[in-house]
């Protein structure tokens, strides 16, 4: 990537700004029947007090400009949505979005959602843009009068007025196609386990992955889960390294040498199901489909071949999927056939539910049933089972907490639980009253056991919630 960095001094060194030009960025094709997303990573130029942050968003701390090159097939009118976060808004802080002679202005106000003031929210702006046919530049400007911090920007979204009916019809179809999530709400709470190739034994040593899978005591594990009162488990398949604890041919094809002879997935599903506990599988979507290493069609085929085999093999033994990394996938492969993906996920079980993790951002698509809810700590409660604004809006509420200050137990020492039984019981109980569910990620050792202190917390939760 060729970058030109220019540094200039203004007013004798009182103020400075940086211009970043990325000359190899192709124009973004603006769609006529679906939403087009202009991410910071796709910008042709940035200038002023704006910088990219971890999580693929742009932080505006003062006056700044971003510019995208767009290719418009035919002239048309477009609504503008701003997916952004504003914690506090200084008087007069605003943004201007313009192309050619068409301009949209918006006065920034604090955004809201389950994370409180400053949550990411998708806001439809009042005015519309008139786009001419052909290649052109679209700019977003924060004026010189702005006082920081201004906002964090995820994307500018262009909604074709002529295609809005089709977009709304697709959303209605997605909602109609969803499987019931009532069982999740009735369950109230469950557990998640990041059992991965990075998990260690209690002494800090680590067995080869397949050896650890062969020695995993399924019955002891299921008995432990039963003691917690959890009614579902989210179990990790693949993570930082793409190991799968089952002999899945399509997985072996995509990730040679990273499957096992023992089908631990089936054994865990059977053991849990006998105890009235449902199994949801976590998949690291980037790694599962080799994101970034292959193009969109190959990524999609790899991923869906795996899902079809999983579906045919496990049928109703797998009640759901928790798909990670979908804001990255949707940014990298915006044309992924999401409706078809949704249908593939139902292979073998039409009632299977899925979520597409968008982290703290609004949902990437309505083609999912429940909110991934990667919150790590309690957040605002649902209303009637869902969320009214921001991340998770319109989806079944499921909040995912971490019992330890990390996801994977890759060290011998297990820190004290982050929550007491009283704290968890209060949050779970209040969520259940509003139709939501809470999942607690527990650190797990390579032998399938957990920390006794954390286990006691969950036993106490069970005594309070399941009484």
Regions found by a protein language model. Give the residues of each.
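Bacterial Sec-dependent N-terminal signal peptides
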Residues: 1-23
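Mature catalytic domains of secreted/periplasmic carbohydrate-active enzymes
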Residues: 21-74, 84-467
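P-loop NTPase switch module centered on the Walker A-proximal segment
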Residues: 80
């Amino acid at each position: 990537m060729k970058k030109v960095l220019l540094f200039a001094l203004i007013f004798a060194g009182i103020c400075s700004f940086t211009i970043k030009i990325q000359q190899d960025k192709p124009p973004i094709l603006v769609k006529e029947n679906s939403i087009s997303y202009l991410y910071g990573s796709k910008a042709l130029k940035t200038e002023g007090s704006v910088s990219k942050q971890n999580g693929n968003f742009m932080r505006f701390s003062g006056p700044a400009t971003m510019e995208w090159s767009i290719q418009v097939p035919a002239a048309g009118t477009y609504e503008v949505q701003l997916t952004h976060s504003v914690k506090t808004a200084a008087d007069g802080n605003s943004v201007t979005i313009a192309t050619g002679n068409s301009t949209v202005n918006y006065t920034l106000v604090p955004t809201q959602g389950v994370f409180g003031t400053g949550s990411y929210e998708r806001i439809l702006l009042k005015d519309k843009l008139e786009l001419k046919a052909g290649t052109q530049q679209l700019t977003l400007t924060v004026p010189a009068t702005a006082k920081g911090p201004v906002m964090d920007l995820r994307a500018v979204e262009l909604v074709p007025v002529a295609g809005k009916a089709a977009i709304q019809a697709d959303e209605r179809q997605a909602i109609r196609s969803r499987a019931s999530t009532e069982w999740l709400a009735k369950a109230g709470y469950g557990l998640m386990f990041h059992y991965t190739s990075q998990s260690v034994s209690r002494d800090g040593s680590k067995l080869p992955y397949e050896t650890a899978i062969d020695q995993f005591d399924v019955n002891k594990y299921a008995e432990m889960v039963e003691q917690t009162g959890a009614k579902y488990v989210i179990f990790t398949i693949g993570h930082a390294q793409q190991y799968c604890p089952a002999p899945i041919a399509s997985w072996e094809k995509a990730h040679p040498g990273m499957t096992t002879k023992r089908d631990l997935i089936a054994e865990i599903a059977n053991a849990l199901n006998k105890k009235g506990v449902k199994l949801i599988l976590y998949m690291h979507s980037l790694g599962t489909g080799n994101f970034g290493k292959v193009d969109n069609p190959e990524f999609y085929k790899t991923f869906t071949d795996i899902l079809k085999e999983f579906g045919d093999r496990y049928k109703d033994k797998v009640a759901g999927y928790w798909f990670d990394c979908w804001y990255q996938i949707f940014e990298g492969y915006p044309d992924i056939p999401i409706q078809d993906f949704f249908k593939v996920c139902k292979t073998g079980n039409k009632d299977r539910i899925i979520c597409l993790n968008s982290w703290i951002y609004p949902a990437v698509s309505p083609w999912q049933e429940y909110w991934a809810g990667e919150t790590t700590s309690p957040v605002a409660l649902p209303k009637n089972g869902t969320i009214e604004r921001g991340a998770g809006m319109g989806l079944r509420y499921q909040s995912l907490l971490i019992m330890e200050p990390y996801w994977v137990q890759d060290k011998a020492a297990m820190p004290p639980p982050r929550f007491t039984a009283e704290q968890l019981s209060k949050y779970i109980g209040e969520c259940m009253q509003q139709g939501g569910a809470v999942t607690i990620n527990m650190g797990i050792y390579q032998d399938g056991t957990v920390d006794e202190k954390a286990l006691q917390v969950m036993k106490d939760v069970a005594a309070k919630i399941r009484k």
